[in-house]
Regions:
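Active-site-proximal helices and loops of the catalytic beta/alpha 8
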Residues: 1-40, 62, 71, 90-115, ...
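Active-site clefts of carbohydrate-active enzymes
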Residues: 35-59
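Conserved, mostly hydrophobic/aromatic
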Residues: 47, 72, 84, 116, ...
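Carbohydrate-binding surface patches
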Residues: 134-168
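Beta-strand-rich binding/interaction modules
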Residues: 161-181
C-alpha cells in the first residue's frame, strides 16, 4: 500500500472545474499499474497537505470536503482520515509544531465522517467491489458490486445544482441512500444539490 498521489492531484483539479470523469481515468491508471491484491491509500489530506490547506478550505467548504472524501475512498483503495479533518479544522497544521484543535467544534462533520467510514467497513462492495464507471462532466457516477451487494454512487463535484443521467439498469428501482436512510425511486435523471453525494443500494 502507498499513497494515491496521482488520484489526489486529479481530485483537486476536478473540484476546481475539470471534468468529473477525469477521476475515473485516474483511478483506472493507478490500479492498472498495481500488482493484484495491492491498494492505493486514498485521501483528501495527509501530513504533507495539512501544512498547506485543510480540506474544508481546499474543497470550498465542509460539504465540498465531504463530497471529495466520498469521491476519494469509494472508487478503490484504502481510506485515510488525517487528524483534524474529521472536525473540519480550517487552519493549516504544521506537522512539527503543537497545534491545539477543538475536537468538539463541528460534531456534525465528525458524525458524517464516522458514518462514511462505518459504511466503508461494513460493506465489502464499497470497500473492494468491482467498479463500473459512468463518465459525466459534473457528477462522479459509478457502481460497486460484490456478491449480492450492489451500490450506485453519485457525487456532485460542483458547488451548484447539477442534473445527471441515471444508468439505465437502475432506472425505475426503489433504492435507499445509505448515507441518510432516505428512500427514493430512480427516474432517468436526478438533480443533485451543491456537493451532494448519494450512496444508493
Amino acid at each position: 500500500m502507498n499513497y494515491g498521489w496521482d488520484y489526489k492531484d486529479v481530485l483537486s483539479k476536478v473540484f476546481k472545474g475539470n471534468p468529473a470523469s477525469d477521476l475515473l481515468e485516474a483511478d483506472k491508471a493507478e490500479y492498472d499499474s498495481l500488482p493484484d491484491g495491492k491498494v492505493k491509500l486514498r485521501f483528501t489530506t495527509n501530513h504533507d497537505h495539512a501544512t498547506e490547506v485543510e480540506p474544508c478550505i481546499q474543497f470550498t467548504n465542509d460539504h465540498g470536503a465531504m463530497a471529495a472524501y466520498v469521491a476519494s475512498i469509494f472508487p478503490h483503495g484504502g481510506a485515510l482520515i488525517y487528524g483534524s479533518q474529521e472536525v473540519g479544522y480550517p487552519e493549516p497544521i504544521n506537522f512539527f509544531k503543537y497545534v491545539p484543535v477543538d475536537w468538539s467544534a463541528k460534531p456534525d462533520v465528525y458524525q458524517e465522517y464516522k458514518k462514511l467510514i462505518g459504511l466503508y467497513n461494513e460493506h465489502p462492495a464499497l470497500r473492494k467491489g468491482t467498479m463500473t464507471p459512468y463518465p459525466d462532466n459534473d457528477v462522479l457516477v459509478f457502481e460497486k458490486q460484490d456478491g449480492d451487494e450492489h451500490f450506485l454512487i453519485l457525487v456532485n463535484v460542483r458547488n451548484e445544482n447539477k442534473t445527471v443521467q441515471i444508468p439505465q439498469s437502475w432506472v425505475g428501482h426503489e433504492v435507499e441512500d445509505e448515507a441518510t436512510g432516505k428512500e427514493l425511486r430512480l427516474n432517468e435523471a436526478i438533480e443533485m444539490e451543491p456537493f451532494e453525494y448519494l450512496i444508493l443500494e
